[in-house]
A protein has these predicted regions:
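Beta-propeller folds
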Residues: 11-15, 24-267
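Bacterial N-terminal signal peptides that target proteins for export
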Residues: 2-13
């Protein structure tokens, strides 16, 4: 019994000694760095926890694949001081199984003559015959959506790129441009009138001329967009010989004055 107590005492002394030894270890080895605090700034300002979205893509009509926008630098030249070049997006084709990739439209093709930068693509579409691409850029909000801007067409056979709107296009003024089914023309709305432009020639024909603040041709006012999600107000006929469109006559709608009492603390 006495021998057992002696061994127990020695064990306790050894244990206390080890605890003291570890207790004297440097503080850096004692514990890991504290976990960062979850804050509103990290969630909403830094967007640290936002998930990545799938890139904007568009299926081809025949279902053979889809196209996406991919960022690339064009004509980059290295100098002693800096790197100079034009950035933009290629339009790239992918097969559904991922086995094939092909650049359909390059940054170079999307750079207007004399411009330093390529067009910033907000939307695009192909003509039915596959020979033209229609590019929407420089969009601005009309009500909720960016439906007014500039439209450019690219001839994929000749690489000719030009802005729609006739010989002297009015900047940021076109809406809802779309190819005719026969791929010969583009129709669009400008200043509440509908126009048709022949591809290549830039010849423009006005289909309506009575557009005004109260007569709206080919598009809709705020109520239709807000309540019914309707914005685009015209369609080509299948044979490309006619256009059906909506016309709104708001001449009987009176103005109603509203007081903005929320833009300052005191009236």
């Amino acid at each position: 019994t006495e021998l057992t107590l002696k061994k127990l005492t020695q064990s306790l002394i050894t244990g206390v000694g080890l605890l003291a030894l570890f207790g004297c270890a440097p503080s850096g080895q004692q514990s890991a760095e504290p976990a960062p605090t979850l804050s509103l700034e990290r969630i909403y300002t830094d967007k640290e926890f936002n998930s990545e979205r799938a890139p904007y893509f568009r299926w081809l009509d025949d279902g053979s694949g889809y196209t996406v926008l991919e960022a690339r630098s064009k004509n980059t030249q290295q100098t002693d001081d800096d790197s100079h070049g034009v950035t933009g997006n290629d339009i790239v084709f992918y097969q559904p199984d991922g086995s094939g990739r092909k650049v359909l439209i390059t940054v170079e093709q999307l750079t207007p003559e004399g411009a330093d930068d390529a067009l910033s693509i907000e939307n695009y579409q192909w003509s039915e015959d596959g020979k033209w691409a229609l590019i929407f850029t420089n969009g601005q909000k009309v009500w909720r959506h960016r439906t007014r801007g500039d439209y450019w067409v690219l001839n994929l056979e000749s690489d000719s790129l030009y802005q729609l709107g006739g010989e002297t296009p009015k900047e940021t003024s076109l809406m809802f441009a779309k190819f005719s089914p026969d791929s010969q023309k583009v129709a669009y709305v400008q200043d509440n009138n509908i126009y048709v432009e022949t591809l290549g020639s830039k010849n423009v024909t006005a289909l309506t001329t009575d557009g005004s603040d109260t007569i709206i041709n080919g598009n809709f006012d705020w109520v239709y967009e807000e309540e019914f999600s309707i914005t685009d107000g015209f369609r080509w006929s299948p044979n490309s010989k006619a256009i059906a469109y909506w016309q709104l006559d708001q001449s009987g709608v009176e103005y109603f004055t509203m007081i903005n009492n929320t833009d300052s603390l005191y009236p």
